[in-house]
Amino acid sequence: MTKPAVQKSGLHPRNRHRDRYDFPALKQSYPALIPFVKVNAYGDESVDFANPEAVKTLNQALLQHFYQIEHWTIPDGFLCPPIPGRADYVHHLADLLAEDNRSVVPRDASVLDVGCGANCVYPLIGHREYGWRFTGSEVNPLAMKAANETIEANSGLNRSIRLRRQKNSKAILAGIIHKNDSFDAVMCNPPFHASAEDAREGSQRKLHNLGLDKRSPLNFGGQQDELWCEGGELAFIGQMIKDSVSFGRQCLWFTSLVSRKEHLPEIYRALEAVDAEKVRTIDMAQGQKQSRFVAWSFLDTAARARWLQKR
């Protein structure tokens, strides 16, 4: 008898990953996943999430099965993101845009992904789900090369996803948003940690949570610019807020994930200091994990509605 689907509580209603992974279907769609799928102690099929190659292959299977991404890979040592959580940000962002568009998610929206990474997952999902056009910024040339290889290897993506190199490691939006650009949304998954040591401690916590020895050579993946920056998440978002002032008439919504809820009060103060017209906090959840993104706009309600009507 087929087991009833168990939903991952909290995920967006349109998220294709609300149910537990359907490994029989994934294996059929992507046979390379077969060697990594084992029956766990609960009698369910799963993969070893402590094995980077298994996680990468699972991502390849998910991207092919749900989003028709036939060719996707990342270099060793780069961040391998969980697809369900990344998709949630995209869907909640779609709802935010719909609020100013008579409750209709705009097709062909133009979105800037700050720090798209080697994985380029937000543009891939956003384009496949909603037909959005993406500009991805990236400071790491190797990450940019890998992302571009994915774009070129999949039919039609190079007409809808473009990449721009951020040559100034201290800048976030400056140098990426050009004079004649306009974006319906900016999205960002900022570096979480404040130092390399902080990032190492984070990996040790993951090892502990997985029940593994701290001396295990496990590589969770992630380059310096993906995992940490001076001052961590709060400093990065603070700089993004300052940068956004210069582009307040070129972008409808600026958004950024915020991993630590305790950072919100300082973020709100920073947004008040730059006279943001509208600030929203969108809560998200995946099981026990709580997350959110903060959105701000320098346009009032009427101006935001006119923006989308003129698209």
Curated annotation (Swiss-Prot):
Assigned EC number: 2.1.1.181
First-listed, main subcellular location of the protein, grouped into a coarse class: cytoplasm
Protein name, per record: Ribosomal RNA large subunit methyltransferase F
Lineage, highest ranks first: Bacteria, Pseudomonadati, Pseudomonadota, Gammaproteobacteria, Enterobacterales
Gene field: rlmF
One GO term describing the cellular component: cytoplasm
Disulfide bond annotation, renumbered to this chain: none
Membrane-spanning segments: none
Classification via PANTHER family: RNA N6-ADENOSINE-METHYLTRANSFERASE METTL16, SAM-DEPENDENT METHYLTRANSFERASE
Catalyzed reactions: adenosine(1618) in 23S rRNA + S-adenosyl-L-methionine = N(6)-methyladenosine(1618) in 23S rRNA + S-adenosyl-L-homocysteine + H(+)
UniProt keyword list: Cytoplasm, Methyltransferase, rRNA processing, S-adenosyl-L-methionine, Transferase
Subcellular location: Cytoplasm
A Pfam family the protein falls into: Methyltransf_10
InterPro entries referenced in this protein's UniProt entry, alphabetically: METTL16/RlmF (IPR010286), rRNA_lsu_MeTfrase_F (IPR016909), SAM-dependent_MTases_sf (IPR029063)
Function: Specifically methylates the adenine in position 1618 of 23S rRNA.
Organism: Pectobacterium atrosepticum (strain SCRI 1043 / ATCC BAA-672) (Erwinia carotovora subsp. atroseptica)
GO molecular function: 23S rRNA (adenine(1618)-N(6))-methyltransferase activity
Family: Belongs to the methyltransferase superfamily. METTL16/RlmF family.
Enzyme class: transferase
GO biological process: rRNA base methylation
